[in-house]
Amino acid sequence: MVILALNCGSSSVKYQLFDWEKKEVVAKGMVERVIIGDSFIMHEVPGRETYRKEYECPDHKVAIDLIIRTLVDGEHGVLKDINEISAVGHRVVHGGEMFTRSVLIDEKVLDAVKDVQHLAPLHNPPNIAGIEAAQAVLPSVPHVAIFDTAFHQTMPEHAYLYPLPYEWYEKYGVRRYGFHGTSHLFVSKRAAVLLGKKPSDCNIITMHIGNGVSHCAIRGGVSIDTSMGLTPLEGAVMGTRCGDIDPAIPAFMMQKENLSAKEIDSILNKKSGVLGVTGRFTDRRDVIENANNGDHRCKVALEIEAYRLKKYIGTYMAVLGRLDAVVFTAGVGEMGWPIREKTIEGLEGIGIKLDRERNKSAMTRKRETLITTDDSPIKVFVIPTDEELVFTEDVVAILDGTYTDHMNFDYSFARQDFVRS
């Protein structure tokens, strides 16, 4: 069984082809600059040089068609025929309250995803476009939706409701939903393995730190709180998003700068966070380099980010009552050792003892690493995430009828004998 996993953004399509019988990734890549022009595909096959080709993709259908043609290409492909693809798994950012698990996509499901796209206007429309495009290119295979929000549907009411007029929740669904669910699921299961415990016996804080950043408090394998909210704007400091701020600031600045609601929303989502403070950078490597060279705004940006991360550890530790481990994952979480160090240092009093040398050596996207001392009561791990593997396993389980939900399903990566492909 060969599964194609697709992750469609507003101007990109990421893909991964997984051979389930061999338990290995046979190809992966990305089409970038979809719609906006000068688009190209980067195609990777293990053991070969990365293949790049410029090809104009005015929409997602053309991009997905390009991916399929590349996968079956005589020189660069890995398939002899398009019919070797057994099913397609699609990342869908927002599933509202309706979807608590991954589901087979039919007309009713697609309509429901469209009904909640107002809750994620930057994310769901390209997800929907990708589903429709893939169905057009691969009409005879099953398509499955895997929702970012599903993992967090276990949050209690007191965690997901905002102290706002209750009618807003009833009429418009205004509540905390949370995102990056598949990433939090994967790394929390792996952390339980590294702890030598069952997920049901673990209390874990997972920290997904990339351009987007979210944290999750996980008790007994279940999400009980998360930092992102109604939208991915809430929570920690991010590459271009502000995260938690005084909610009066937008109205204040709209008056001062004569900004529209659309303009202030764009600023908070695209011109704030690390970019807003530094004025130049979203890539933390650039921020770290310039901070080390004396750039005050870059130094402050790092301090703000690490300070907010530290606060979330304390907050979620209080919520959980007992903590077994903290996990760093995603691009910055996996590679940004200075940010991890700034976040963890000073937490010895609550049982987290950083091993600085281990932390500095944990700079790989392949290895799971303990970065606290052996005698640290609370462990801190760096665990590379693998959302596409979650997509793949959900698809396979739905097709063979063994899938229940993310809490009870026996994922391969939750086993002691799991080996990364």
UniProtKB/Swiss-Prot annotation:
HAMAP family: Acetate_kinase
Binding-site residues, Mg(2+): 7, 387
Pathway: Metabolic intermediate biosynthesis; acetyl-CoA biosynthesis; acetyl-CoA from acetate: step 1/2
The protein, known as: Acetate kinase
Pfam families: Acetate_kinase
Binding positions for ATP per the UniProt entry: 14, 208-212, 283-285
Highest taxon in the source lineage: Bacteria
Broad class of the protein's primary localization: cytoplasm
Cystine residue pairs: none
Known catalytic reactions: acetate + ATP = acetyl phosphate + ADP
Source species: Geobacter metallireducens (strain ATCC 53774 / DSM 7210 / GS-15)
Matching CDD domains: ASKHA_NBD_AcK_PK (cd24010)
Cofactor section: Mg(2+); Mn(2+)
Ligase found in the keyword field: no
Its biological purpose: Catalyzes the formation of acetyl phosphate from acetate and ATP. Can also catalyze the reverse reaction.
Subcellular location: Cytoplasm
Complex and partners: Homodimer.
UniProt site positions, description: Transition state stabilizer: 180, 241
Annotated PROSITE patterns: ACETATE_KINASE_1
GO terms, biological process: acetate metabolic process; acetyl-CoA biosynthetic process
